[in-house]
Each structure stands twice: as C-alpha cells, then as structure tokens.
Amino acid sequence: MSLHLYNTLHRRVEPFEPLDPACPTMYVCGPTVYNYVHIGNARGPVVFGVLAALLRRRYGALRYARNITDVDDKINTAAQEQGVPISAITERFCAAYREDMKKLGVEPPDIEPEATAHMPQIIAMIEQLIERQHAYVAMEHVLFAVNSFADYGQLSRRDTEEMLAGARVEIAPYKRDPSDFVLWKPSSDQLPGWDSPWGRGRPGWHIECSAMAAAHLGETIDIHAGGIDLQFPHHENEIAQSRCAHGSSTFARVWMHNGMLNFEGAKMSKSLGNIETVHELVAKHPPEALRYALLSAHYRKPLDWSEALIAQSVRTLNRLYGTLRDLAAYPARAIIPGNIEAALDDDLNTPQALAELATLANEARIQLADTTHHAAAEVTTALTRLKAKLLGAGLALGLLQQTPEAWFSQGTNESDETHIQALIDARGAAKQARDFVRADAIRAQLAAEGIVLEDTPQGVRWMKQHT
C-alpha cells in the first residue's frame, strides 16, 4: 500500500504524491515562545515527527521545517509583566521548548526558522502583495484585502459572515473591510520593530509563516500541518498571502490537521485552568509514556487527556519493556514490520500500529513460555525475529528507544541503585536463611520507596513505580 493522507483542503484521504519524489517538503507550525507549551501543543510535533520519519524511509530524504514565532504581542506582554527584556522571554522558552520536545522523543526538524531572522523576506512578500494589489497601506498598517482573493475560505469552507463570527477579528477604522487582516503594524519605541517602507513596525502573525515557508521550501510545498485550531484564520490566511504573492494556484498540496486535547472530559483552556504544560508533565511522568499517550488516538480525532491515560500508557510500556528484558539473550537489529508500515500508510493510523506492537509482544511472550516443545535453534530464530520486529515497530513510532534497564530505573540515580541492590541482596540472604519475615519486611520497605520486585528464574528484577 502506498502512503495515503487525509487532505483537509479536499476533505478526503488521498494518495500522497510529492512534487519531487527525491525530496518531499513539509512545513509544521511551531510554537509562539512566550511560555511553556501545554501538552496539546506537543501532539502535532509528536505525530508529524512520526510522519517525517516515515517520509524519510519512503523517499530517502525530506526537507522539513518547523518554525519558531519569536515576535508576537503575547511575548511583549509576558516581558512587560515579568519586567525582563523580550529576548529573555524568547530565549528562555525557545530553549525550554526544544528540551521538552527532545524528552518526548521528537527529532528536531531540518530547519527551525525564527521569524525575527526573516524580516527581509517578510517585508519583500508584503511589497509583492501591495504591488499585485492584494494589500494596501492605511494609517501605518499594511492589510491584506480579503475580497481581492476569490478562493478565500476554501480551506475552512466558511463564508465571510461565518469567518467574522468565528474569529477574533479586529474592527478597525483603517480597514476597508472588516475581514481584512494585518500584514504589518506600527511599533512604539518600547516594542520590537524593524524599519520598513511603511515605517518602523513588526509583522502580523500569518505573514511570518508564509515568508519562512517560501524562503526554505519554495513557493509550493507538499505538506503543511498544524493543529485544527490553526485551520482558520491562520492557515486560511497563509494560503491567501502565499498564492497572491507568488501568483500561484497552489501553496500547500496537502493540508493536515491534528485534533485537540480535552482534559478529563473538558476542553483544555487557560480560562478553565486545566492547562498542563509539557515542562511540568515530563518532570512527573516518564516522557515516553506521554509520547505513547499522544499516539494512542488517531491524530485527527480529539484526545481525552487524563491521569488514567498516562497510567495506562506506563503499564503498557512496562509490559513492552518487560518483554524486551526477557528477550535480552537474543541479539537483534530493528526491522520495521510490514503491518506497521501499512498502518502508518493508512493516514498515520498510530492506534493500529500500537495494536500491532502489542501483538508482537504477546507473540514473543507465548514463544518464551513454550520453548520446551521446539528445537533450540528454532526457538532462537523465532525469538530473534520477533525481537527485531518489536524493536522495529518501536522505532517507527519513536518508542522503545532506551534499554529495559533504563526504563525500569527511571527516577533513580547511582546511589539509589546501590541502596536498592543492597536491600535485594539482604532479602536474598534472608530467604536463604528461611527468615521469610525479614524477607517480606525488606520487600515492603522497597515498596514503600516506590520499588517493585519481581522474582524470576533469571533472578530478582526491580522497577521504579511510575504513575
């Protein structure tokens, strides 16, 4: 099966056919760096990171850009409230974002353009829009004339009245039409600004992505992706700007949108006070469990985020890593199974891929439990093959990329491990001396410290209990 993706523009699943099969292009909208990102903001990077890896396997190369918005009124407000320079806000939260994504197993994009480094390209694109009569200057602002673009609304499929009702549209006296949006606005001396033909100012949010995408990926790109909340007005405006500036019929050939996260059944929002940041979550839970949870529902569907979901993800990973630990005697290199690739080819069906991963682990456990009825060479071949597929399935999803020992000892340090091993040895000595009361007391002590013991034919194993 070839890769098929749901294209929001056409409202259907379509075969993916890149403009250049030697190197597809993909642009994903990144964060505005004024605070730590919440867990909903991580869904796109995780899911589209899986897609990026799939595209590299399929085509051998990929040009993947994910931007950083480092000029925005939210950033200005945060700096003012905290009494620090704007650069202190952007540098701090840009670094935090990269670190949080790394912990979630998100590979960095090939290109991570920052808006402030692309002012010449942004200004040049605005000049093109004015020259082509798709934009106008009014009271030191430059605005895009929505009525000049006949296809406006093709992505969100809204009429003008719906657009005005569904977005925070500023009704300003300098607008020719209420639906027109800002490309450039004036800056006071206290705000960041750049010299331009229209005076000192700064760009609107939408033009930044259009200019950066064109600068790094060209006037027409294969895939543009982001959260469903960006479909309108951000992505709709990107299409209008880009097509009008370049005089082209297509900006992005495939538009992909991931669904939003709900928290304990309610929409995640600052007003409800139920936002959970990635920064907080990776400090409390194994980051790989958060990644697993983000992949557990199809990317286009809403995902109900909860402590129960995280706990279930931890338990599942305990089983998967436990299987790999039991397969330690069988060296193997990762081989991505065909049914995993088929699941991902089906519009990134990660729930199906995770189900296939679980099936592989179950098959391995059955084989491990039934080694006496088969020749040793046959058992070795079968278990080595299953381990290779298990590792490969994990690789395709960005899971199982640490050793079982590292997974089970998360949250402990070398001193903790020495202490734990000493107690395990003491428990072993107590059992050998048939002092079972002492042995049980040691197990209880370790349990109170969050350490779970497992007695196996290979010896005592332990794991740090995670929530």
Curated annotation (Swiss-Prot):
Disulphide-bridged cysteine pairs: none
Co-factor requirement: Zn(2+)
GO cellular component assignments: cytosol
Residues spanned by motif 'HIGH' region: 31-41
InterPro entries tied to this protein: Cys-tRNA-ligase, Cys-tRNA-synt_Ia_DALR, Cys-tRNA/MSH_ligase, Rossmann-like_a/b/a_fold, tRNA-synt_1_cat_dom, tRNAsynth_Ia_anticodon-bd
Xref: CDD domains: CysRS_core (cd00672)
Record Pfam families: DALR_2 (PF09190), tRNA-synt_1e (PF01406)
GO molecular function list: ATP binding; cysteine-tRNA ligase activity; zinc ion binding
Record: residues binding ATP: 270
Free-text remark on how the cofactor is bound: Binds 1 zinc ion per subunit.
Subcellular location: Cytoplasm
E.C. number: 6.1.1.16
Reaction equations catalysed: tRNA(Cys) + L-cysteine + ATP = L-cysteinyl-tRNA(Cys) + AMP + diphosphate
Residues reported in the UniProt entry to bind Zn(2+): 29, 209, 234, 238
Subunit and partners: Monomer.
Protein name: Cysteine--tRNA ligase
